[in-house]
Amino acid sequence: MDNQSTINNNGNNKVQQKVRSACDACQSAKVRCGREKPTCRRCQNQGKTCVYSHARPLGRPRKSGSASSTTTMTTTTVNMNDLRDDAMIIAGSVNGDSEYGSPTRFRSISRVNNDHGMNMNMNNDWPGIPPLPSAGPRIPDILLDDSDENYMDMFMSVRLLGSLSGPSTVTDHHPLPPPEEEDGQEGYQNQHQHHNDPHSLIADPSAATEWDLGFPFDQHSSSESLSLEPSSAGAHPGDIPTSSLSKDGMDFTHTRGSQKISPNPHSIDSRTSSRDKSFNHHRSLSTLGSRTPNTTTTSSSASSVGLTGSSTTGFSRRFRGGGGGVLSLSRRRTECTCCDSMLQILAELDRHIADRSAISLDLIIKLEKETRAQTVAILHCDLCSQTFRPRILILSGLVLEAVVELLEEILHQHQLLGYSTATTTSNTTSSSLSSSLSSSSWIPSGPAGMELASPPPSIFDNNNTSTTTTTSSISTANRPGKTVDICSLWLGDYEISGPEKQEFLKHLLTARLRDIAATIHQLHETMNRYRHRPAFKVGTLMLGEIYRHVQAIVKTLDQ
């Protein structure tokens, strides 16, 4: 009876053995196990069969122990799936996105198999693990953010990186060929050493900046004669690239000592799709030829912007020759002259406004047509609209506002804003219409000297109860506006004057103002798509005020 109980007890002892708290997969990977049963979280995510083995005895095996226990302690079976998981953990730790440990912690995991005498170190050249990044200068993370809140931080980071000089080169973000054979391995090593030298990125304290405006403030800084046609391939002075180099998905544009930065989606996609390519991508250099400008420049201006004419030498050779590399826009972003053209229109408007002499009506109409055409071209330009440049869009709105101010001066000088053919039947009707018009949004805006001294008077006369055509007496002598020289109107040998001339001007200017309102509305809709950014939000509010101002004038003329 006692013997049977002993056997039962021995059997119970075999069944009720202790189970380890960590599963076999987590124990072999040396990571913390979630201890969920029957399947832990790690094994469930990786699709493995979770096994919780019995607890092994601690300490050294006894000499008198069985052979099975000795074999268990001295023999370790290498599971290739566990080794692959360990390699993935180390790769994630190197790249900084490991979910099992600290990004900066590098662990050496070894497996010893006494049967085969195999020793594997996971930090060696294990297949599938990308190499460690080089020790060269690292671009700050703030440069990867293109939001308006970080414009100043990005600008300071660019000044810390410094400005480099070099010939003009257009590069692409595809795998690049190796350096030329005639340069030899020595030149490639010199190139590598210069690229990883932090002293080659020292900022130039005398570098001029155009970061705040987004376009060249000084129009006389370059002596090139740029064409304004849309088919022209010449770039405006603010966006002339000098050389190209891609690093970590960023594009740098060199503009007379300053650098502009914008993310390149192609480089970012290539970095996320293939880490091996991204780790070695910044070591590659472009060998594409440089662009030849269409315009003729002097030697001094060409040297100031770094142009080399029709040179087709590889970029790597010029980089090793002593010049630094500067990053430019990719080939798909062709240079445009929208900003330069709009600045020329603004300069011409400013010159006519500052001039004390009278401005002719035909010149105002010409400037109005050029401004609207250039604004439409900017709205369809990929570089101006799709690359999130709010400054050129805000500049277009300001130029349109200046044109509206000149057209408004014509209306005031000929009393067209106070001229009405309204037919009233009672004082009540005219009073209600007058109150509704005065309550409409009238926002005077524009440069100094062109603002309205007071809101425009009502086009309805409260004292008029007859059905006759009346003309309100509006005094323009006290208004500090611009004098407009109206051209004569001739129909053959007959000169159109008097009320007929006023009706013609009213019809002409109303049509022009409606076209301007439609252009401003289209510009407002384009900027309203990116209203979450501060610069676009400010531009949207400004264009809304200009649009309401133009609509109020058109509504007054339609009465």
UniProtKB/Swiss-Prot annotation:
GO MF, any single term: DNA-binding transcription factor activity, RNA polymerase II-specific
Q: Which residues bind DNA?
A: 23-50
Q: What does this protein do?
A: Transcription factore; part of the gene cluster that mediates the biosynthesis of the antihypercholesterolemic agents phomoidrides which are dimeric anhydrides. Probably regulates the expression of the genes from the cluster.
Polar residues bias (residue ranges): 255-267
Start-end of Low complexity biased regions: 222-232, 286-316, 462-477
Which residues lie in Basic and acidic residues bias regions? 268-279
Q: How is it used?
A: Phomoidrides A and B (also known as CP-225,917 and CP-263,114) are potent inhibitors of Ras farnesyltransferase and squalene synthase. CP-225,917 and CP-263,114 inhibit Ras farnesyl transferase from rat brain with IC(50) values of 6 uM and 20 uoM, respectively. CP-225,917 inhibits squalene synthase with an IC(50) value of 43 uM and CP-263,114 with an IC(50) of 160 uM.
Note the Pfam families from the entry. Zn_clus
PANTHER family named in the record: MONODICTYPHENONE CLUSTER TRANSCRIPTION FACTOR-RELATED, OLEATE-ACTIVATED TRANSCRIPTION FACTOR 1-RELATED
* Entry keyword Zinc: yes
Entry-linked InterPro entries? OAF3, Zn2-C6_fun-type_DNA-bd_sf, Zn2Cys6_DnaBD
Can you say what this protein is called? Transcription factor tstO
Gene3D superfamilies (UniProt xref) = Zn(2)-C6 fungal-type DNA-binding domain (4.10.240.10)
Q: Which UniProt keywords apply?
A: DNA-binding, Metal-binding, Nucleus, Transcription, Transcription regulation, Zinc
Span list, region Disordered: 166-316, 453-477
List the subcellular locations.
Nucleus
- Identify the GO cellular component terms for this protein: nucleus
